[in-house]
A protein has these predicted regions:
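Sec-dependent signal peptide recognition
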Residues: 2-8
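C-terminal motif of bacterial Sec signal peptides marking the signal peptidase cleavage site
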Residues: 13-16
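Residue-level detector of conserved, well-ordered beta-strand and adjacent loop positions
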Residues: 18, 35, 52, 126
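N-terminal helix-cap/turn-to-beta initiation motif at the start of protein domains
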Residues: 19-35, 132-133
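Contiguous, well-ordered beta-strand patches that form the walls/edges
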Residues: 40-43, 58-122
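Broad, structure-driven detector of short, well-ordered beta-strand segments within folded domains
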Residues: 46-53
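Short, low-complexity, Pro/Ser/Thr/Gly-rich segments in the mature regions of secreted, periplasmic
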Residues: 122-133
Length: 133
């Protein structure tokens, strides 16, 4: 009889378990190299932004359109003079453009973090290391 109670209790316990795990939404970082294209085609990219430790560096293509090897070959010493401090918190990007100007935009990631959309700004950037189109 005692074994029956243990079995019933075990069954009741196992059946009453509910998987209520709330998985957090994926977190994507803004850190890294991102290319911008004036068209919807990433192959037309002529500008790259690199976000590193709160500083945004800007690079322009010399022989456009630049391919992945070209963009990957650039180092911070190749960036245009002047940098922009930035903060990325709660899906909001704030870039200090200096002289009292600031870019504040909501960021939405797609393609497993390989593409980002800016709310009302230059629209989209592609992460350099992604295969997103």
């Amino acid at each position: 009889m005692r074994n029956l109670y243990i079995i019933v209790l075990a069954i009741f316990t196992l059946v009453s378990c509910d998987d209520d795990t709330n998985l957090p939404a994926p977190y994507y970082s803004i850190e890294g190299k991102w290319i911008w294209s004036p068209s919807d085609n990433r192959a037309d990219a002529n500008t790259m932004y690199e976000f590193v430790d709160g500083i945004r560096y800007t690079y322009y293509c010399i022989t456009c359109p630049g391919d992945e090897a070209y963009w990957n070959s650039l180092e911070t010493s190749d960036a245009i003079p002047g940098t922009n401090p930035y903060k990325f918190e709660n899906d909001t990007l704030r870039v200090d453009l200096h002289f009292g100007n600031e870019l504040v935009t909501l960021i939405t990631f797609e393609c497993d973090g390989g593409k980002l959309f800016m709310d009302g700004q230059f629209s989209h950037l592609w992460r350099l290391s992604s295969d997103c189109q």
